[in-house]
Amino acid sequence: MQILNLFYNFAVKFDLNENIPNKAMKKIISIIFSAMMVTSLMAQSAEPKQRIVEDGGTGPYKAIMKEEASLAEHTIFAPQDLSVFNAKNRLPVLVWGNGACNNSPFEHYKFLNEIASYGFLVVATGFIPMNDDPYHGPMSTTQQQIESIDWAIAQNSDPDSPYYNKIDVKHIAAAGMSCGGLQTLFNCADKRITTLMICNSGLFKIENAHNAVGGMPMPPKEKLNEIHTPVIYILGGKPDIAYENGMDDFHRINHVPACAANLPVGHGGTYGQPHGGEFSVVALAWLQWQLKGDKKAALMFKGDDNLLQKREGWTLEKNEKFSKLK
C-alpha cells in the first residue's frame, strides 16, 4: 500500500509534465487509484473476525469469541477486558478439540464462551464460527492442540501481546469432545498439561475400532498410561455412543486421579443449549478447581456428599486416587 501511495504521489507531482500526454497521465492515475482501493478492501477483509456470544456469557468477565492473526485456524475465547488480568490475576488456559475432528468449534462455541467468561483463555482448534452453519471442510489435526499451547505460552512472554504477563502458563487444561477427546488423549503426555477433560469420548478397543470414523486419531488403550494429570470424563450416559469407550478408559486408569461424570443426554451433550447447559456447569467446576484451586468448586466432586450427585440426572464415579486430590 505504501508503494502504491508513492507511485500515486509521483504521478500527481508530474501530472503537468509536458512530456506525458494529459489523457495518458489521467489513465495512469486512475489505474493506480483502483489498485489502491482493491488493496485497501483486501486489507479490510483480512481483519481478524470477532463475535459476541450470548451477551458475553454469565460469568464476571464478559467474553468475546475472536480470531488472532498470530494463530491461524484457531478460535480464541477470552474476556473482553484484559486490563483486569495481570501477574497476580492470570488467565488459566483451556485448549479444545472439536467433535468429529471438525476444524471449527461451531458446535461448542456457547459452551466455550461460557467458560471464558469465568476468567479463562480458551483456544479452540479451527476456524471461527460466525453463524450456526455446520462446518464443511478438512478435518483438524492433533497438532493444532499443541499449536494452541505453544501460542498461549508465546503470547504470555511477548511484550507486544495484549496477553503479555496475563496468562497462567503453569495451569493448562487439554480437552475435547468425541474425536476432539481422542486428539486430547493423543496429546496427553505433554508435560505442560496440568489436567485433562475428556467429553463424550474414549479410546477404541481393538474389537470396536471398526466403528471409528476415518481420519480419527486411534491411539491404543496403552496410551492411557501416559496420562500424568488428574482427568475427568464427562459423558452422556448409556445413550452416548462413546459411553462404553469412555467408561472403559476410566476403569483402566488407576495411576492418576480420575472420575467419570454422566448425564444421560446422549452423545451430543448440552453444548448447544444456552450457555452450554449442564455440561458447562460441570466443566467449569472442574476447571475452577484444577486450574484455579477453587475449594468451593471442588465440592462439586469431592466426598460422598458431592454436589454433582445432587444435580438432577448426574452420576459420578471416582477411582481410588481421586480422594488424594486437594
Question: Model segments located where?
Answer:
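Short glycine-enriched nucleophile-adjacent loop
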Residues: 181-190
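Short beta-strand element of the alpha/beta-hydrolase
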Residues: 88-99
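Catalytic nucleophile-loop/oxyanion-hole region of alpha/beta-hydrolase
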Residues: 101-107, 111, 129-147
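The feature captures the conserved acid-bearing segment of alpha/beta-hydrolase catalytic domains
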Residues: 194-273
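Gly/Ser-rich "nucleophile elbow"/oxyanion-hole loop immediately N-terminal to the catalytic nucleophile
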Residues: 83-90, 134-182
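N-terminal cap/lid segment of alpha/beta-hydrolase-fold proteins
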Residues: 45-89
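Short amphipathic alpha-helix adjacent to the substrate-entry channel of hydrolases
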Residues: 106-124
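Alpha/beta-hydrolase-fold serine-hydrolase catalytic core, especially in secreted/extracellular enzymes
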Residues: 256, 265-268, 273-326
